[in-house]
Amino acid sequence: AVDCNTVKSDLVGCVGYLPSGTGNPTPQCCDGVVKL
């Protein structure tokens, strides 16, 4: 699992993370994120 605080503090803005069930990284990737 990816920690939401780690994702939010990442300066590249969630690159390398995807919201579960989608194919598009977003700034709101904290919800149900999975590591690529």
From Swiss-Prot:
Keywords tagged on the record: Lipid-binding, Phosphoprotein, Transport
PTM per Swiss-Prot/TrEMBL: Phosphorylated by Ca(2+)-dependent protein kinase.
GO molecular function: lipid binding
Function: Plant non-specific lipid-transfer proteins transfer phospholipids as well as galactolipids across membranes. May play a role in wax or cutin deposition in the cell walls of expanding epidermal cells and certain secretory tissues.
Family: Belongs to the plant LTP family.
Protein name, UniProt field: Probable non-specific lipid-transfer protein
Organism for this UniProt entry: Pinus pinea (Italian stone pine)
